[in-house]
Amino acid sequence: MLGLPTETEEDMRAIPELADQIARRYYEIPKEQRNGKCQITTSTSFFIPKPFTPFQWARMYSPEDYLGRARIVNHTMKQQHNQKSLKYNWHEAYVTVLEGVLARGDRKVADAIETAYKMGALYDAWGETFHYEIWTAAFEKCGLSIDFYNTRERSLDEVFPWDFIDTGVTKAFYK
């Protein structure tokens, strides 16, 4: 996962380094004992703070920031000794941003969802049919800001849309 609140560049670079260490271990096996070619696929998703977790107060990054983090991992992957055995995939940053709004949005987001649908957003979980510009236009049309829901740090005293739900764990526990 990329984009956690305490993440450092060293953390990002450690992902491809670990993949390379695994490939190195494979190549330590004598050729006659190996079972096929070594191919390691590493995939990352981007951090989305969720309700009822200690991260519910955390901010998300912008799509550009997430893609920058993926570029660091991808670039480091290409620098590894066993780069031909390594492959890297990452989740779509703009889909992540929308997922963040849906995860922590309030009742006003319902209007934006309906508006996006009426503007042509359909089957948006499929990458080839996802149109971020429809969603941003829908939010703007409803007078809402995606950044309000995602990129701002939330106060420990903020009242969340899900606070009325009793999960058996108090908000104070997460703080």
Task: Tell me what each language-model feature is.
Residues 1-53, 65-92:
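Conserved C-terminal portion of the radical SAM core fold
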Residues 54-55, 158:
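Short His/Asp/Glu-rich catalytic/ion-coordination signatures at enzyme active sites or charged loops
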Residues 13, 17, 62-65, 97-105:
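A broadly tuned preference for mixed-charge, low-complexity surface segments
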Residues 56-62:
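Short glycine-enriched, charge-decorated loop/helix-capping segments at active-site entrances
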Residues 79-175:
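Radical SAM enzyme core and accessory elements
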